Every structure is written in structure tokens, then in C-alpha cells.
Curated annotation (Swiss-Prot):
NCBIfam families found in the cross-reference section: argS
Alphabetized GO MF terms: arginine-tRNA ligase activity; ATP binding
Quaternary structure annotation from Swiss-Prot or TrEMBL: Monomer.
Gene that this polypeptide is encoded by: argS
The protein's name: Arginine--tRNA ligase
Protein family per UniProt: Belongs to the class-I aminoacyl-tRNA synthetase family.
GO cellular component terms listed in the entry, alphabetical order: cytoplasm
HAMAP family xrefs: Arg_tRNA_synth
Organism name: Shouchella clausii (strain KSM-K16)
Keywords annotated in UniProt: Aminoacyl-tRNA synthetase, ATP-binding, Cytoplasm, Ligase, Nucleotide-binding, Protein biosynthesis
Length: 556
């Protein structure tokens, strides 16, 4: 339990004691004490609506109940400086400043672990994200999904969940046959043949580049094979090269996966047939018009879904169901799928299938990633200037950098459309949020170096009593909010909570710095206390940025 959680628990105990002492309810009647951080800091550090909850039991007006509670509340015992009653009976608590100072040794002791919690209680979570078809470069939707998925994984990991990251390789469908045919055509074209592209072929530059690479490596030796053998080779070679490229781009993007799961392996292992058999054994399928159907309407879907077509082939849903069954078979307690905006209709049918398999649908969560629009020079960027095709993740990283790309994709709710301002992302100004946060970190590091050069020591045991100004306490409150922000972001899977938190913390630091002289050579005790505060700030900013996959530079 972190510092602020301990404080909240202490407050709950004291509120409960005050309720009983004021004889407003019996032991069994006292409701759970809800404590929330008010949006307006003028309303204190924590607020409770316990007076409203007690109104029916105590048969009194909430405000009168609040007044009785405050009269019976031991502020000193709870570490509260003052209490205010607001509106119809909300009780606002303002923390004692001495208690806030205790945050500094906690952060300095926990270091990289500051912000961690056991909210997840070791729950095993599998997050599947990106999972782009290995038939071309990663585009902006994949880029946003990668940033969101990885950030959620980082946050949940810090909050005590056991997280696994997985990429599902779609290597068993028609798209792979089209990849093979496209690469075959480009290979023969590079060798000088007048070979037409297949009707559903891929026309991207990446296929041409792979064909040229193959010619450089092997010349025309594959032209000698019969077409069936050559297409089989092209399938494997093209898939290998596309995956290599995807892995390189994601590695540069600071995204790594614990497992790359092949769709083909589902067929080779018999898992697809097994998933279908499980549904049949549970009487969740039926035969009609020569096809096998899933009774998905029984679980909220708008219509039943075909699993096996009349010709005996599977629909795309069948291997997907078996894949999710496999995820549960591997011991995961919860599944999170990060999917593109075009997958809205997929959710109810997969949730229905999971229920049909016998699992609680609450164990299946979906994070939808909405579309991204790029803007540069005030105009929408529709195509890459270099290739004339859609802008890729690689190009965006080259244009604005990994840090800005990751932060911008995480700073808004994933299920809302994002306008990505490329000019803002590279600007060295306070309007650029990632620059603003990184500059705060670099500024603190500069102060710490200055203190080191002057030989002013500080540690977790430094006397912190000289810390007494309003700006110092505002900064401490911002630092203290980090564990709660991580816990909330993890339980609700809202990565933007951490992006916004990092910005708010940077804002508190800049506001403090603008009116405060950290190092005073005439007052070593004050300087040491403030340097300890700066170190706690630096560690917290760094930890927040790490969750976002963003670097924390020491110099800028």
C-alpha cells in the first residue's frame, strides 16, 4: 500500500470512528467510506459524501450530519490540517503539510518502484495488440494501437498484474497467398519479365524492395522452379521479410512482445478443430443450409454466425474463437484485445463465443483504437511525400521522433479520433506537451547537478522541516498522486491518465521553479531539503514517462 493509500485508509478509519462516536449509525449500519480527490484543488485533497449516505439512516439533513462528523473528527490523529463542509454536505479534507513531506523519503527509497501497487493482485492478463497483417508496413492505426497497447501493459504491470504481450500473426488467410503472388510477380519483373500483378495484389514499395533483395541474394535461381513451388517459396520468404521489418520497426518504437503467435499453428496443432468441437459438445452450434452455425444470439449477438461454410471451409471467426480458447487454456485470467476502429462489429460476436465456450464475458475486454489524421503546416497529410502511399510508422518516427509519437498517441482516449499535429510534435515550446514534460525533467537534473557541484548532500534522511511554501506543497501533492493515477489507469485501462498526469506534474514543477530559489548557499539546510524534493520530482517524472515509453533526458 503506497503513501496516499495508507492516508486514505487512515481517513476512512477516522471517519468511521467519528460516525460511531456521534451515534449517527450502528457498527453494522456504517456504509463504506468513499474518498475521492476533488477536481478543484480548492476543495481539498480528499472529499467524501458519507453525510449523504447516512441521511436515511440518521434521519437528518446531510449538512447537519456533516457538521456532527466534523465535530467528532480527530484531525491530529488523521493528519488533517483543516476540514470544510461544501454544498449539501460534502466533507473536504486538507492534508497536514508534515504528512506531505513524508512523501520525499518514500520516493527516494522506492526509486524506480515508486508508483507500484498490488491493485492487480497478480491477475494474469494477456494483452494482444498491433497484430497487423504481415503484408506491408505498419500504418498510423497500427502505430497508435502499439503505443496504447504497450502503455496499458506497462501500467498494468506496475499496478501488480502479471502481464503478457502478444502479437497474433495472420499467416493463414488469403492475404498471405496474395503476398506470395505479389512477390512472385515483382521478382519476375525485377528479372525483366513482363509479369502482370495479381488482381488482389499488394502494390506497396515494400514488396518491390523485397523482390530486389531476393534477386540480389539469389539471382534468377527461383525462376527455374515450377510456379507452385515458386509460390510456396515466395510465401515463406515474403512472410519472413515482412515480419522482420515489422519487428525492426516495433523495436525502434520500444515495443516488445513476449510471444508472436502464428495463426497457422492453430491449424497445425488441431486447435481450430478442438475449439469447434468444444462448442459442439456444449450444444452451442447447429447445422442449417449445409453450414455449421454458432448460437451467438443466445448471448446478445444480433444474429447467429456461420463457423463452417457449405464448402467445408472455416469463416474467419472460427480460428479466432479457437485462438481465444487457447489464450484461456494457457492460464490467463483476463484477455485484452486492442483492435482497430473497423472491429466494432467483431466485439459482440467474440463476446458471445467466449460465453458459449463457458467463460465469463467480463474476462474479455476490447480497447478500440480510432483513426488518426496527420496535420503539417495547417493542412491534412493524406499521403507520404516520399512514397505517395499512406504514411508509415517508420516515417512518422523519422519525422517527429519516437518520444513525441508515443506520447501523442497515448495522450487522448484511444476510442476518440486523433488529430496529430506534426509541427507541434517537433516544436521546442511549452505548447508541445512532450517537450514540456521532458524539459521539466532536464531542468530538475540540472538543479541536482548544481547541488552536487556545490557539495550539498541530501538523502531520504534529510531534515525536511524547512519545506514550508505553498508551491512546495503543491508539488508534493502532485508527486503523491502518482500511485493513485497508475492504479486508476490500470483498472480502467486508460493510458491517457498517465500522459495527463505527467503533464500536470511538469506543470507543478515549472510553477514551483518560477518562484523558488532551490539552492541558497547561505542556507544549506533549506537547500538540502529542496534538493531532496527535486530528486523525488525527477524520479516521479522519469517513472511516469517510462510507462509511456518516453525517454527522460537529463539535458536538453
Amino acid at each position: 500500500m503506497n503513501h496516499m493509500e495508507r492516508k486514505k485508509e487512515q481517513l476512512r478509519v477516522e471517519v468511521r470512528r467519528a460516525v460511531l462516536q456521534a451515534e449517527l449509525a450502528t457498527e453494522s449500519e456504517v456504509p463504506s467510506v468513499l474518498l475521492e480527490a476533488p477536481k478543484d484543488k480548492a476543495h481539498g485533497d480528499f472529499a467524501t459524501n458519507i453525510a449523504m449516505q447516512l441521511a436515511r439512516i440518521a434521519k437528518k439533513a446531510p449538512r447537519a450530519i456533516a457538521e456532527e462528523l466534523v465535530a467528532n473528527f480527530d484531525r491530529k490523529q488523521a493528519g488533517i490540517e483543516k476540514i470544510e463542509i461544501a454544498g449539501p454536505g460534502f466533507i473536504n479534507f486538507f492534508l497536514d503539510n508534515g504528512y506531505l513531506r513524508e512523501l520525499i523519503p518514500q520516493v527516494l527509497t522506492e526509486k524506480d518502484d515508486y508508483g507500484s501497487s498490488d491493485v492487480g493482485q497478480g491477475e494474469k492478463v494477456l494483452i494482444e495488440f498491433v497484430s497487423a497483417n504481415p503484408t506491408g508496413d505498419l500504418h498510423l492505426g497500427h502505430a497508435r494501437g502499439a503505443a496504447v497497447g504497450d502503455t496499458i501493459a506497462n501500467i498494468m504491470d506496475k499496478a501488480g498484474y502479471k502481464v503478457s504481450r502478444e502479437y497474433y500473426i495472420n499467416d493463414a488467410g488469403n492475404q498471405i497467398e496474395n503476398l506470395a503472388a505479389s512477390l512472385n510477380a515483382r521478382y519476375l519483373q525485377v528479372l525483366g519479365e513482363d509479369q502482370p500483378m495479381p488482381e488482389d495484389g499488394y502494390h506497396g514499395q515494400d514488396i518491390i524492395d523485397i523482390a530486389k533483395q531476393l534477386v540480389d541474394e539469389a539471382g534468377d535461381q527461383y525462376r527455374q522452379l515450377d510456379e507452385k513451388e515458386r509460390l510456396a517459396f515466395m510465401r515463406d520468404y515474403g512472410l519472413k521479410k515482412e515480419l522482420e521489418k515489422i519487428k525492426q520497426d516495433l523495436n525502434a518504437y520500444r515495443v516488445e512482445f513476449d510471444k508472436w503467435f502464428s495463426e497457422t499453428s492453430l491449424y497445425e496443432s488441431g486447435q481450430v478443430e478442438r475449439g469447434l468441437q468444444v462448442l459442439k459438445d456444449k450444444n452451442e452450434t447447429y447445422e442449417k443450409d449445409g453450414a455449421t452455425w454458432l448460437r451467438s444470439t443466445a448471448y446478445g449477438d444480433d444474429k447467429d454466425r456461420v463457423l463452417v461454410k457449405q464448402d467445408g471451409t472455416y469463416t474467419y471467426l472460427t480460428p479466432d474463437i479457437s485462438y481465444h480458447l487457447d489464450k484461456f487454456d494457457r492460464g490467463h485470467d483476463r484477455l485484452i484485445d486492442v483492435l482497430g476502429a473497423d472491429h466494432h462489429g467483431y466485439i459482440p460476436r467474440m463476446r458471445a463465443a467466449i460465453q458459449a465456450l463457458g467463460y465469463d464475458p467480463a474476462r474479455f475486454n476490447v480497447q478500440i483504437i480510432q483513426m488518426v489524421s496527420l496535420f503539417q503546416g495547417g493542412e491534412k497529410v493524406k499521403m507520404s511525400k516520399r512514397t505517395g502511399k499512406a504514411v508509415t510508422l517508420r516515417e512518422l518516427m523519422e519525422e517527429v521522433g519516437v518520444d513525441a509519437t508515443r506520447y501523442f498517441f497515448a495522450m487522448r482516449s484511444p476510442d476518440t479520433h486523433l488529430d496529430f499535429d506534426m509541427d507541434l510534435a517537433v516544436s521546442k515550446s511549452n505548447e508541445n506537451p512532450v517537450y514540456y514534460i521532458q524539459y521539466a525533467h532536464a531542468r530538475v537534473c540540472s538543479i541536482l547537478r548544481q547541488g552536487e557541484e556545490l557539495g550539498i548532500p541530501y538523502s531520504a534522511n534529510t531534515d525536511l522541516s524547512p519545506i514550508a511554501s505553498e508551491k512546495e506543497y503543491e508539488l508534493l501533492k502532485a508527486i503523491g498522486e502518482f500511485p493513485g493515477a497508475v492504479a486508476e489507469a490500470a483498472t480502467k485501462q486508460i493510458p491517457q491518465r498517465i500522459a495527463n498526469y505527467a503533464y500536470d506534474l511538469a506543470q507543478a514543477l515549472h510553477s514551483f521553479y518560477n518562484v523558488t530559489r532551490v539552492i541558497d548557499t547561505e542556507n544549506k539546510d533549506l537547500s538540502a531539503a529542496r534538493l531532496a524534493l527535486m530528486k523525488a520530482t525527477q524520479m516521479t517524472i522519469k517513472n511516469a514517462l517510462a510507462l509511456l515509453g518516453v525517454e527522460a533526458p537529463e539535458k536538453m
